[in-house]
Design a protein with these regions (language model features):
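Aromatic/pi-system hotspot detector in well-structured domains
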Residues: 29
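A beta-strand edge to alpha-helix "cap/lid" segment located at domain peripheries
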Residues: 1-24, 34-123
Length: 123
């Protein structure tokens, strides 16, 4: 696993967003994942809650671009990526947000164990 591989995990997630299918996106999260989403005050603790978030979020037709990233290879089974990304929505509006992902290797490939995303305070 190297920086390009970790960035590829984001690309996989972003491609899942483009399907507009919440189950496709949720499948990238570990069963015990935690999501602190960009446009919701509710912490999501499981697949049911994560899917519920993406049902609403995907209605906006989001596509993300990573503006800055910081990859850390913690072990053979755990990696992080944090930085800033910008979402462009179907209506042309945009939001920049800070993000952090903790990925864990599993029998099904790499899964998102923790995902935190928060809109930039200055807008």
């Amino acid at each position: 696993m190297n920086d390009a591989d970790v960035l590829g995990l984001f690309d996989q997630w972003n491609t899942a967003l483009s399907t507009l299918n919440p189950d496709t996106v949720t499948a990238l999260y570990a069963d015990n994942a935690v999501l602190l989403p960009t446009v919701s005050n509710q912490v999501r603790h499981n697949h049911e809650e994560i899917t519920d978030y993406f049902v609403g979020f995907l209605q906006k037709s989001p596509q993300g671009v990573v503006d800055e990233f910081n990859v850390n290879i913690l072990s053979d089974t755990h990696v992080t990526n944090s930085g800033i990304y910008t979402f462009t929505f179907g209506d042309g509006s945009k939001v920049s947000a800070r993000f952090s992902y903790l990925y864990v290797a599993s029998d099904d490939g790499w899964k998102i164990l923790q995902h935190h995303s928060s809109a930039m305070p200055e807008g």
